[in-house]
């Protein structure tokens, strides 16, 4: 029996059966790996599909911010239009600035002419009051303003009218204008100091 077992060779059929049994066992792990890969890929696809609407929505929202989107193009055109309007406003300002020096020069000329006329008027008025003060008898203590000078001139005219109506002046004295003027000046000063000027203020 020992000889039969040891001497009996293994048949090729038995080898093929053993090989065929071993091959499925070897082939099963790769199939399991492939199934795992397929499951992983399907799970990834399902996850991608679930996130697809959200991604599409986010893509839709972000699409408005893309530089190539139509809304962005319209905004760019509007901003360009506003920039053009600003440029036009700047151009208008430059044109108005070009015309401003002429108006400024005209205003300066008008001011200069007005100042010259005012100086001439003031000078002529001062000369007239200086001449009037030479005619009106005044006291050394008089510091008369222009209004007071005019009032004193009116009172002096009233005094002269009263003197002409009286017969106090002698014909000889009247012939000498210088002496007459001195006497009138003295009489007018006395008249002022006696208060006759204040009494005749109602005239």
From Swiss-Prot:
Q: What is this protein called?
A: Twist-related protein 1
Location comes to: Nucleus
Regions of compositional bias (Basic residues) in chain numbering: 34-43
Organism whose genome encodes this protein = Pongo pygmaeus
Q: Which GO terms describe its molecular function?
A: DNA-binding transcription factor activity, RNA polymerase II-specific; protein dimerization activity; RNA polymerase II transcription regulatory region sequence-specific DNA binding
| Span of domain bHLH | 109-160
Segments of skewed composition (Gly residues): 47-66, 81-100
Q: From the UniProt entry, list the residue stretches annotated as the region Sufficient for transactivation activity.
A: 162-192
Question: Gene Ontology cellular component?
Answer: nucleus
Name the residue ranges with Low complexity bias: 1-18
Chain residue ranges for the region called Disordered: 1-106
Q: What's this chain's function?
A: Acts as a transcriptional regulator. Inhibits myogenesis by sequestrating E proteins, inhibiting trans-activation by MEF2, and inhibiting DNA-binding by MYOD1 through physical interaction. This interaction probably involves the basic domains of both proteins. Also represses expression of pro-inflammatory cytokines such as TNFA and IL1B. Regulates cranial suture patterning and fusion. Activates transcription as a heterodimer with E proteins. Regulates gene expression differentially, depending on dimer composition.
Subunit description: Efficient DNA binding requires dimerization with another bHLH protein. Homodimer or heterodimer with E proteins such as TCF3. ID1 binds preferentially to TCF3 but does not interact efficiently with TWIST1 so ID1 levels control the amount of TCF3 available to dimerize with TWIST and thus determine the type of dimer formed.
Organism placement in taxonomy = Eukaryota, Metazoa, Chordata, Craniata, Vertebrata
Q: Which UniProt keywords apply?
A: Activator, Biological rhythms, Developmental protein, Differentiation, DNA-binding, Myogenesis, Nucleus, Repressor, Transcription, Transcription regulation
Say yes or no: keyword DNA-binding present.
yes
Name a biological process GO annotation. Answer: muscle organ development
State the superkingdom: Eukaryota
